[in-house]
């Protein structure tokens, strides 16, 4: 394995201003990296302390020339690809395929064109590639069976990356569901947390029977950093907690944290026919490659989210 030496520390992160990117920036800086990264052109720059020391470059992943120039300027030792059309329920599949496949190819071409070879290129895929056909604990040997456009685009991205394995030390991460402070309420757990933090009496949800392997975003970025530094090129790794929680268990945790029970209504508009029914992962391969990693209990993550949101509400009251 090729390891990045402490004397040479610069990382280039796509999607740096996104939910995961901000935590990745903190993780990289704490490890001694100078952080460069992309943000969507025209988007307002966030006033976020996590990004205060970062070099932000407004670049569209579909603009191959601009991406090539940005990568050449950064000359990174490590590349972390987080930018994507990331929500399963996105209603523009053409854009999802463009960004997640063509955008990734543009990044790999840009990275391969840098005058010094990066020591690691981490691509964030998704455990959604496993689909909903295989019950139980999923490891990386399970045949992919994507059940929606987002998952198909991520699997196609993985296959596209194989074309660059002879030129770049590519590592693919398949994160299962994860959450934390700052994630959009378009996702399930932040939606639930927001309702409880606001003391709302009721909530409308979709499929109550789903089970998910939930991680804390801080644990996910810790795993990404370990993979960058170990650089096991050509391999694919689940990033997960190895524990699946039902929606009922999550609601019970939030009820204990918030101090009341919310009234739940199942709204057919939120029920997706192709919903992945159960996702639980094995991280045995990850453990062998990088050693033990932290696993934050889900109730601690939820409490962090509820307390933070309530604190923000009190500050603006």
Residue ranges of model-derived segments:
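Rossmann-fold cofactor-recognition segment
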Residues: 50-63
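NAD(P)-dependent short-chain dehydrogenase/reductase
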Residues: 135-136, 159-213, 217-226, 251-257
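Conserved Rossmann-fold NAD(P)-dependent oxidoreductase catalytic core, especially the SDR/UDP-sugar
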Residues: 81, 105-149
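N-terminal Rossmann-fold cofactor-binding loop
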Residues: 38-43, 61
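NAD(P)H-binding glycine-rich loop region in Rossmannoid oxidoreductase-like domains
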Residues: 61-99
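Active-site helix of classical SDR
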Residues: 153-156
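N-terminal Rossmann NAD(P)H-binding glycine-rich loop of SDR-like oxidoreductase domains
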Residues: 11-31
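C-terminal substrate-binding subdomain of Rossmann-fold SDR/epimerase-dehydratase oxidoreductases
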Residues: 198-317
